[in-house]
Amino acid sequence: MANVVNMNSLLNGKDSRWLQLEVCREFQRNKCSRQDTECKFAHPPANVEVQNGKVTACYDSIKGRCNRDKPPCKYFHPPQHLKDQLLINGRNHLALKNALMQQMGIAPGQPVISGQVPAVATNPYLTGIPANSYSPYYTTGHLVPALLGPDPVTSQLGPVVPQTVQVAQQKIPRSDRLETSPLAAHHHQQQQQLQHQLNNINNNNNHSTAGAAATSTTATTTTNNAAAAAAAAAAAAAAAVMGHHTLEVGKKRAADTTDMFPLVFFCSFPSPCVFAFLNCSIFGFLRLWFSLFNLRH
């Protein structure tokens, strides 16, 4: 996790983290087989305070002017190879400080008011290590333009007015789900409709087989029902005709055209008795005629 660096202490020269060295864990367990001049970690003596597995190197010792013996110096006096590493850290610290002061328009040596510069989450001493390899979700902050400085081409062209540009957000593909295209969804809907139509055709075929068996019964029932309905309609019509005129005692009413309907119906269709009488008369006449014809000859 990145350490929170107070920019006020960094610009005022009070940040001493570039003087910190990590203590050898094998040395703390008395198991380190390397000398202090060979190990890349610190081997501090007993009088040096260790905090969170790190010690602070003596700045005067790096410059070669520390003469504190009684009491002994509470800071670590590093060997030569660790001094070289601390000097590199010091140069990086100074370059970062000068770049920030130049960007903010602060002259070197000018004190910075507390709270003037916000705290920034960064570690200026992890140089040469790509940040994306350890934190792929880390995005560069506002310190990167500050370190790079202004563009000389842009400064010659004059100030640029910022404009608001709407950028379409790119959809990040996910490996745990499959995106459904509109064409595939439409094709799936057509398949569902076709399957529904096939199911309806099969159901109609099944019902037609069962309905064919009941067709004859239905036809007979329909014929009987039609005859009964016709008889009921005729009876209802006759009742309506008869009930249309009320009979008044002592008065005669004029003959209606509908009253002649039963007579016409009766005369148009003679009864079987009439047919029998006519049949007997005709045969009798023919018999009599044949008998007279035979007598003459």
Swiss-Prot record:
- Nucleus as a keyword? yes
Q: Which cysteines are joined by disulfide bonds?
A: none
SMART domains per UniProt: ZnF_C3H1
Question: Membrane spanning segments where?
Answer: none
Q: Which GO terms describe its biological process?
A: apoptotic process; compound eye photoreceptor cell differentiation; eye development; muscle cell cellular homeostasis; muscle organ development; regulation of alternative mRNA splicing, via spliceosome; regulation of female receptivity; regulation of gene expression
Q: Where are the zinc fingers (C3H1-type)?
A: 18-46, 52-80
* Keyword Phosphoprotein part of the UniProt annotation: no
Q: Which GO terms describe its molecular function?
A: nucleic acid binding; RNA binding; zinc ion binding
Tissue-specificity statement:
Expressed in embryonic muscle cells.
Principal place where this protein is found?
A: nucleus
Q: Which domain of life is it from?
A: Eukaryota
Give GO cellular component annotations, separated by semicolons: cytoplasm; H zone; nucleoplasm; nucleus; perinuclear region of cytoplasm; Z disc
Question: What's in the keyword line of the UniProt record?
Answer: Developmental protein, Metal-binding, Nucleus, Repeat, Sensory transduction, Vision, Zinc, Zinc-finger
* Compartments where found: Nucleus
Function recorded in the entry:
Required for terminal differentiation of photoreceptor cells. Vital for embryonic development.
Stated family = Belongs to the muscleblind family.
**Name of the protein in its database record:** Protein muscleblind
Q: What species is given as this protein's source?
A: Drosophila melanogaster (Fruit fly)
The record lists the lineage as:
Eukaryota, Metazoa, Ecdysozoa, Arthropoda, Hexapoda
